[in-house]
UniProtKB/Swiss-Prot annotation:
Organism of this sequence: Caenorhabditis elegans
Protein name according to UniProt: UPF0046 protein C25E10.12
Family: Belongs to the UPF0046 family.
Phylogenetic classification of the source organism: Eukaryota, Metazoa, Ecdysozoa, Nematoda, Chromadorea
GO terms of molecular function: hydrolase activity
Annotated SUPFAM superfamilies: Metallo-dependent phosphatases
Domain of life the protein comes from: Eukaryota
Residue intervals passing through the bilayer: none
Gene3D superfamilies found in the cross-reference section: 3.60.21.10
Amino acid sequence: MSDNYVLVDPLSSKPIDCWKKYVKQGRVCEPIKPMRLDTPIFENKVRFVCISDTHEKLHEILPYIPDGDVLIHSGDFTNCGDIGEVIKFNAEIGSLPHKHKIVIAGNHELGFEDGEEMSERQLAGLNMLGINKAYELLSNCTYLCDKSYEAYGLKIYGAPWHSMPGYSFFRQRGQKILHKWNQIPAKIDVLMTHTPPLGHGDFNAWDKMDGILCGCAELLNTVEQRVKPKYHVFGHVHQKHGVTTNGETTFINAALCDHKLRSAYDPIIFDIPLPPGKTKQ
């Protein structure tokens, strides 16, 4: 882990105020146009295809998912972690041709969190939903939970944590969720999380707790101050599908469903040059 430790922001529990402070400090969030989905695939570049928040609608989206070398799904592929939903998703993602298919859980993958403390889910009335260790049914993809994966010499890390109470993988804003982000290693190429970082793809008009911004300040600071990946891919917020940049990292909200869980958006693609000495063979 890098020596550049990230500290909890005193305003992390107030995302709107926190982001206003960051803007005054000169933090950058610039929208950029996604690559065209019909862009040719090159032998000297790794093509990533990004999707998230398919919410039991992957079968509707399959015909529109372009080919590529690495497919990544940033969580919420089910609605409640039901065993039938997981089996269905596994079959559907298995039908795609991508050589590497990498998946993380989202808050809707109930039961996927090992050793989950259930009090929040009980309060939300969700404690009877989901199946423990249902991720073991994902035989057609690589499931990451606070783990790394390497494809074509490129390092990818996946983490499912978020700050929405009542669901699996919930951690409070501040030190508790920062503890999880501290596990992300430096020198990775692609970071996958379910929740967005503060200020990038996190506009949520339906969030009743945090107003219109629900991204994580500790995640943003981890990305910008310590990890500095080339790409950060996430979902969770359905209203802000798209691509932004801070000038160093490209941020991708790859959520494909709208707030009514209707398939509404296209996958997003990007390329990373093959590292020296690496091939796709």
